[in-house]
A protein has these predicted regions:
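Sec-dependent bacterial lipoprotein signal peptides
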Residues: 1-24
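N-terminal, charge-rich interaction modules
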Residues: 24-87
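Mature extracytoplasmic domains of secretory-pathway proteins
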Residues: 64-132
């Protein structure tokens, strides 16, 4: 009985340290994330004019804060600055081939930013048939994002970012 408690306590302590290490893992810098996205672009080899747009946050808490701000700003002032920057990368996709590689370490922030950017770009152009969107995120795109990309007539390719070292 005492051995079981000791094993259980040791396992709980190990789990606590693993969770602490995961929570404290620092996200890649903007330069590192940009390099990762360019490496993924080289691997995928999308056709068209290549544009790389990183979606980054200082920490998981910063990502949640940006999501909350985007929701409030979206209702009052339109899309966030990150979404507007990404929407500019989609320009010309209604008539030319454009490959946009975008993403970052936080799935929810990636998803919201890309959906907002697509909505913003589709206000100008109903269809963006020349767009290949390489979505780099820890989680697969949601059905809502897939539907938005399909409505735009664009191609969606998902890749997961490399694990932090």
């Amino acid at each position: 009985m005492a051995r079981d408690r000791a094993r259980l306590g040791g396992a709980a302590l190990g789990l606590a340290f693993a969770l602490l290490a995961l929570a404290c893992a620092t996200p890649p810098s903007d330069e590192e994330l940009d390099a990762q996205l360019r490496a993924i672009a080289a691997e995928v080899k999308p056709r068209g004019e290549l544009r790389v747009v990183s979606i980054n946050a200082e920490s998981r808490m910063d990502a949640w804060t940006k999501l909350a701000e985007d929701e409030v700003q979206g209702k009052e002032h339109g899309a966030s600055q990150q979404a507007r920057r990404l929407a500019r990368a989609f320009e010309k996709a209604n008539r030319l081939r454009v490959a946009v590689v975008t993403g970052g370490p936080y799935a929810d922030l990636n998803e919201q930013t890309v959906r907002s950017a697509l909505d913003l770009a589709m206000e100008k152009h109903q269809r963006m048939a020349g767009l290949t969107l390489v979505f780099v995120s820890p989680e697969a795109p949601t059905p809502e994002l897939r539907a938005t990309v399909n409505r735009a007539g664009s191609l969606l390719v998902h890749r997961t970012p490399p694990l932090p070292r």
